[in-house]
Amino acid sequence: NCKIPYIVFTIIIINIFFMDKNFFKITRVLDGGMGQELLSRGMKPKGTLWSATALLNDNYHNLLLNAHLDYIKAGAEVIVTNTFATRRIRLIENKVEDKFEYLNTKAGEIAKKTKDDYPNILIAGGLPPQNSTYKADDRSEDIIKDDFYNQAKLINPYIDFFYFDVLSSIKEINVATQSIEEFNKPYLIGVHISEGTELPSGEKISELLNKLKNKKLLGVILSCVSP
């Protein structure tokens, strides 16, 4: 598992919508990993749902909210919705696909509640790989796009920008960014580097940077680096 903290450094800055366009021109701090944090606070995970257990079990809702708040108190300027494990495929694996809408919506609601006390905090809508983590998604583009869109539309009302978390190929990134076009929000891309300067797909990060041209792009970060 990748356990590096989410410290943001910007590689590309273009234009920003609905946010201060200079926000990522300096180093910023995002919150840390949520799964391990919730475990340390007493959450008992269900199957492979990991951090999504805190959404499925309403006894853990305050635990999740307090984790968000404590990251803010520790200096986080951006928090990420607890949606890494609420992708449809993970819910299917755990026989709770019928909770897809509820879990993603609840994650957005809990994240947004932090603005009651911290109105200036930014909320990133976390959109994880829609198939396996740390591997390039070789499914059809239409299927990948639908999966990203269906999760994005549920968290869209609660967020300031989208954050694509640990994507593994240029194809996946292109499809993911296309999936959110109708929401007209900026986005940050988090990539997984597996071999030096390469994505798990074998493509170099320089290839990705040369192809990224979108006025809603906030930047690119290395959200996970394999040893």
Where are these regions (language model features)?
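Generic detector of N-terminal low-structure segments
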Residues: 11-14, 19
